[in-house]
Amino acid sequence: MQTISAYILAYNEAEKVKAATESVLWADEIVVVDSGSTDGTGEIAAALGARVVQVPFNGFGDLRNRAIEACNCDWIFSLDADERCTAAVRDEILGLLAGMPTFDAYQVPRRSFMMGRWIRGSGWYPNFRQPQLFRKGSMRYTLEPVHEGYELLTGKPLGTLRNAIWQFPFRDLEELMRKADRYSSLGAVKLAGKRVSMASAFGHGCWAFLKHYIFKRGFIDGWAGFVIAFGNFEGTFYRYAKRYEQAQDWSPPPVEPLRREEKP
């Protein structure tokens, strides 16, 4: 049977990396790609048998390409720290590798869990990202600062697994806000060279809310769907607002040193 490496990206994910690693203990090799965590993430993964590789963060595309280089098996299964493989996906993958897989790369459905429920709307199911199961050498990632793309290096089309993994994107609303801030900063880099205004930032934010809440049917998930849509408004608004800020000269006025005036 062909061998498989599972790689996990993690940065200060001490609360999540244990469960993620335990969900792929069936793999022939587990590689955790860490970017200088200070909360014990690497130590937790290593204690479970993972090989921890330190890679400086130069964008997610570069990070994932470095992860591929670190894997030694025939096939690679990509997992993020907030994702969990399921028994059904494990069995489906091992069944594929026991035979002759039809495709060289497969996308994997994800069921995302937030605010106590599986999110079915908001574009969150099947919520495919880049192919998560692929033969080593069959693809590489592109180098966008955020939401990195991929390039297939095979003549075969992309396959799809039948079963879904779990994703737990936000531990709580505080983490949602923190991630929105981080990703809006990375997204602002992608807008370099584009003319934006605060009005366009607001317009893009409103469209992001409507797209997720109405057109992607976020409303079917109650308040969780509203929070997701509002979070997309915030992330999109601040992405454009930060780009606008970068293009302005908003230096504060000079302040002269103030000393006590001498009395005559």
Residue ranges and their predicted role:
Residues 7-29:
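Short, well-formed alpha-helical segments that are part of the catalytic scaffolds
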Residues 23, 34-44, 80:
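A conserved acidic beta->alpha catalytic loop
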Residues 42-70:
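Conserved donor nucleotide-binding strand/loop of the catalytic core
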Residues 76:
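Short aromatic/hydrophobic "clamp" motif used to bind/position activated sugar donors
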Residues 26, 47-49, 129, 154:
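Short, structured coil segments at secondary-structure junctions
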Residues 62-68, 86-250, 257, 263-264:
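Catalytic-site signature of metal-activated, phosphate-bearing donor transferases
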Residues 3-5:
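Cell-envelope/extracellular polymer assembly enzymes that use nucleotide-activated donors
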Residues 18, 39-48, 88-89:
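Acidic helix N-cap motif at the loop->helix transition within catalytic regions
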